[in-house]
């Protein structure tokens, strides 16, 4: 019986059924490589530029360098790191996990993060290698013992022999430019009126707009359908109806990976959250 409950929990939390399509902020776009260089973020709306790092909004001073798997890392020209000659074993493991998550949609990273936070029943925000590997297996992601131990060692911040869950989840998110991180933070700040770092599904419902969603424009979905599909990512009988900044970032990191340019991503966020 416990096995069945665990399986149902993992399926519900993961939300990775191939037949399910998520809503807005989850556009069905191909994972195409990003342009290797963008020289200015001056396209950002003026009222959002105050949320962006100065280096990002100063025309001609920022270069977005292409990161792993075609995604971008925000770097200023003066501090662009030299490319590493090869990927170490742990980085290769992380890239494998990230790719498997993203292959299952924009909510893939968020689903994995939510599952592991639920698995952390004692609230320690840590997992040992066996717990980590078994949790991945329940989600259909397989690592051998050496790979799991390598990941745990890399994110063992206190020498306890366990993986720091939040550090691992942050590292798993697809890299984003500073412009994308800033507009995500601006959207969450608008929702988080109390400043306690938590918003409710009702908060999302009260602000979110799907009118610019491509499937609304094409007539395939109504605005209500888009809203329902989006909220399903955060609200169900297995979820608590509350959304933290980390969960919001988890979700939008997956969305970001499917959008070609910073301009496109910022425009989507501006429309969806009426920034």
From Swiss-Prot:
Signal peptide range in chain numbering: none
Descriptive protein name: Calcyphosin
Subunit structure: Monomer. Does not form oligomers in the presence of calcium.
PROSITE patterns on file: EF_HAND_1, EF_HAND_2
InterPro entries: Ca-bind_SignalingProt, EF-hand-dom_pair, EF_Hand_1_Ca_BS, EF_hand_dom
Key words, A-Z: Calcium, Cytoplasm, Metal-binding, Phosphoprotein, Repeat
Organism lineage: Eukaryota, Metazoa, Chordata, Craniata, Vertebrata
CDD domains per record: EFh (cd00051)
Domain of life: Eukaryota
Keyword Ion transport belongs to the record: no
